[in-house]
Swiss-Prot record:
Pfam families for the chain: FliT
Source species of the chain: Escherichia coli O17:K52:H18 (strain UMN026 / ExPEC)
Gene3D superfamilies: Flagellar protein flit (1.20.58.380)
Protein name, per record: Flagellar protein FliT
Coiled coil: none
Record family assignment: Belongs to the FliT family.
Signal peptide positions on this chain: none
Primary localization class, coarse: cytoplasm
Listed GO CC annotations: cytosol
Record's keyword terms, sorted: Bacterial flagellum biogenesis, Chaperone, Cytoplasm, Repressor, Transcription, Transcription regulation
GO biological process, one term: bacterial-type flagellum organization
Entry superkingdom: Bacteria
């Protein structure tokens, strides 16, 4: 059975999914990016299944190599963008924790509101 056309098509689909994920990450559409991840994983599994059945010829491997490089480049860029987002979220969580600690420590002062006042002298 010659699955070369099917394998090539599967790789093209993976490239499209990879480009979509990069676009979503670039546009900071994080929910959509996460939602698209399963389709990407399924496409990778489909390729793995196809290559288990029959190893691609040397010619086919040469044709697929540029696609693989593009996918790996896209994946690297997505990871960089995700790391930036994770750093932003960690900073926000840290700020929130500090704010919560301050409110917990100084928020309940026996019914008095602590606020700066003008000097009365």
């Amino acid at each position: 059975m010659n699955n070369a056309p099917h394998l090539y098509f599967a790789w093209q689909q993976l490239v499209e999914k990879s480009q979509l994920m990069l676009r979503l990450a670039t546009e900071e559409q994080w929910d959509e990016l996460i939602a698209s991840e399963m389709a990407y994983v399924n496409a990778v599994q489909e390729i793995a299944h196809l290559t288990e059945e029959v190893e691609p010829s040397t010619t086919m491997q040469e044709q697929l190599r540029p696609m693989l490089h593009l996918i790996l480049d896209n994946e690297s860029k997505v990871k960089q963008l995700l790391q930036i987002r994770m750093d932003e979220l960690a900073k926000l969580v840290g700020q929130s924790s500090v704010q919560k600690s301050v409110l917990s420590a100084y928020g309940d002062q026996g019914g008095f509101v602590l606020a700066p006042q003008d000097n009365l002298f």
